[in-house]
Amino acid sequence: MNLFSPHPDDNLLPYDGIVNDYGVIFTPQQADDYLDYLQQHIAWRHDEAVIYGKHITTARQVAWYGEQNFAYTYSGTARTALPWDSVLSDIKQQVEQQLAAVSPVRFNSCLLNRYADGSQGMAWHSDDEACLGKDTVIASVSFGATRKFAFKHKQTQEKREIMLQHGQLIVMRGSTQSHWRHAIMKSSKIHTPRINLTFRTMLPQG
């Protein structure tokens, strides 16, 4: 099912990477049900980071799930994946079905972020950790409030922006993480929560 897909084969980036917008892939009822479930049943906790040597606890909440107890380190903090939740697995399968026709991907983990309102965002960063490998594919699904998602090129500083809606899927591919940073922009006009699921493929550990 693809309820709204502008042109999923089009690249939202002008160069040095690929970002495809698959549009809203869930019905309004499905998206509402998933949002309610995720808010109530995911093991949310406040994110932690080490920035300039200081330990920071963020207002934004996170959760990390996977097929194995993957260790994932970013912003100076290590995390261990929880076992797959059945509803997360269902969402993952629907995302993989969207990608299957052109570029089949099998994801084995999911990092979730919960933003209570527009006062919470995500600073500029790239998902370029070694455990994800080179030219990794990351699928991002949004539930809840519409939020502005921005990209900024690491060298040229050129920007691209997209408003991510309830039930929308975008996919980052190729050299995107090597050349672009991305962020969730804050807004004082948003008073409802947003949950973002980023499905990833972790490399074998050991």
Where are the regions a protein language model picked out?
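Non-heme Fe(II) oxygenase metal-center motifs and adjacent flexible, charged/small-residue loops
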Residues: M1-G206
